[in-house]
Amino acid sequence: MSGASRVFSCRIYGVLREDGKVLLTRSAFRGSSFINFPGGGVEIGEGPMSALLREFVEETGLAVRPVRALYSSERAHLSTQAPIQIVSAYWLVERVGGKLRAGGNDDDVLDLLWADPARLPVEEMFPADREFAGYLPNFLD
C-alpha cells in the first residue's frame, strides 16, 4: 500500500418504487443538471440509515423506511472533487409519510420525476449511479 492518503465520500441513496416507477431527482451542479436517486453524503458522526432518512426528506419532502439493501459500489468512482473516491449504497425504501415536493427543494434539487426502472435517463447520471441503474430492473423483480 502506498503512503498516499485516501479520502472517501460515503453516499447512500433510496429507491422508492410506486406504480411501477422509481423516484429520481434532477439536481443543479456547476451550471448544469444531473439525475440521480434521492440521497447523498453521510456526514461526520452520522450513520448511513440516518443519512438516508435525512437526505430523502430534504430532497423530496417524504419520510421513508428502509426495506432492504439493493447494491453497493463495485468499482472505484472518483468524485468531481478528485482525488475523493465515492462509495455508494442503494436501498429500497417505502413511503411512510410526508408530502412530495414536486418542484424540488429550493436548494440543490430542481425537480422530481418518476421513471420506468428499465428506461432510466442514464445519459444524465454520474458514473456511480449509471453503474447501479444497469442492475436496478433485476433487483426489483
Region spans (language model):
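Conserved N-terminal beta-strand and adjoining loop/helix that marks the start
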Residues: 1-23, 92
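NUDIX/MutT-family hydrolases
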Residues: 92, 102-135
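Active-site-adjacent beta-strand/loop module that shapes the phosphate/pyrophosphate-binding cleft
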Residues: 75-101, 113, 136
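Short Gly/Pro-enriched turn/cap motifs at secondary-structure boundaries
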Residues: 2-6, 82, 104
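Short connector loops at helix/strand junctions that flank enzyme active sites
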Residues: 9, 17, 37, 64, ...
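A short coil-to-beta-strand element that immediately follows conserved catalytic motifs
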Residues: 63-72
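Short, charged/polar surface micro-motifs in flexible loops or helix N-caps
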Residues: 17-22, 30-31, 43-44, 72-77, ...
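Conserved Nudix-box catalytic region and its N-terminal flanking loop in Nudix hydrolases
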Residues: 18-58, 62
